């Protein structure tokens, strides 16, 4: 056999000899290597790109973007979503929103000058499932769906990202980066695009880049995010006053292939 990754017949033989676990691990390793190589290639291109290439830096909602309005007990948050760069996260979020999954859920974790987090039916950070859980094992085997990391999306102030319990464990929980601290001086333009470094001067959490799927950006309503971030919390970062999502209205949807 030339390779278990290129010939299905060889893969079958390998499965017989060494078992599914071994072959699946090798397939995953190969897929991860290819993804890393592709990301490195795209990152080099992104470093040379102009501002127009970074959708978070434009408040207008483009044709290939979606838009939602998160109505909370503290006010509204208007967000645009990026299916081009994070199709799984956007489809998951939009579907949950349309089905009312998030209605009534609380912001269970709030850390001022960091982020606000919601999307857990349990209300304590332990729950939440993707739309594919129990339905499509290729997208979610039971632990969540994969991270989608793009050199064109970052954890700048106002960005919407998937919360996870480790790589590729995305379910339904999400957070909005709220920090207003200037992090630009700690970033190198050899690794981060200059326009993004400038954006980080207004806040965000660059330490989260590469570990969490960014899939949206607040285009209005950051005052609501700041209001939520300023409430009194317990030692476990849970608001003493319950803050809930009333509803999430899909203003502009997206047709997935």
Per-segment meaning from a language model:
Residues 4-7:
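Bacterial Sec-type N-terminal signal peptides, specifically the leucine/valine-rich hydrophobic h-region
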Residues 10-257:
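Cyclophilin-like peptidyl-prolyl cis-trans isomerases
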């Amino acid at each position: 056999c030339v390779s278990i990754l290129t010939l299905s017949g060889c893969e079958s033989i390998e499965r017989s000899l060494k078992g599914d676990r071994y072959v699946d691990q090798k397939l995953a390793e190969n897929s991860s290597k290819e993804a890393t190589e592709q990301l490195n290639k795209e990152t080099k291109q992104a470093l040379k790109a102009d501002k127009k290439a970074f959708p978070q830096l434009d408040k207008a909602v483009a044709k290939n973007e979606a838009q939602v309005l998160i109505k909370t007990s503290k006010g509204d948050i208007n967000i645009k979503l990026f299916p081009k760069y994070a199709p799984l996260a956007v489809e998951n979020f939009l579907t949950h929103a349309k089905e009312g999954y998030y209605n009534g859920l609380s912001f269970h974790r709030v850390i001022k000058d960091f982020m606000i987090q919601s999307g857990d039916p349990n209300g304590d950070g332990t729950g939440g499932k993707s739309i594919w859980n129990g339905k499509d094992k290729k997208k979610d085997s039971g632990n969540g769906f994969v991270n989608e990391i793009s050199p064109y999306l970052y954890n700048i102030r106002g960005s919407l990202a998937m919360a996870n319990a480790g790589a590729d464990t995305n379910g339904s929980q999400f957070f909005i980066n709220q920090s207003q601290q200037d992090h630009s001086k700690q970033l190198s333009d050899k690794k981060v695009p200059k326009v993004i470094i400038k954006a980080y001067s207004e806040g965000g959490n660059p330490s989260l880049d590469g570990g969490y799927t960014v899939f949206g950006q607040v285009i209005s309503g950051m005052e609501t995010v700041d209001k939520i971030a300023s409430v009194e919390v317990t030692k476990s970062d849970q608001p003493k006053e319950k803050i809930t999502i009333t509803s999430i209205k899909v203003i502009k949807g997206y047709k997935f292939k």
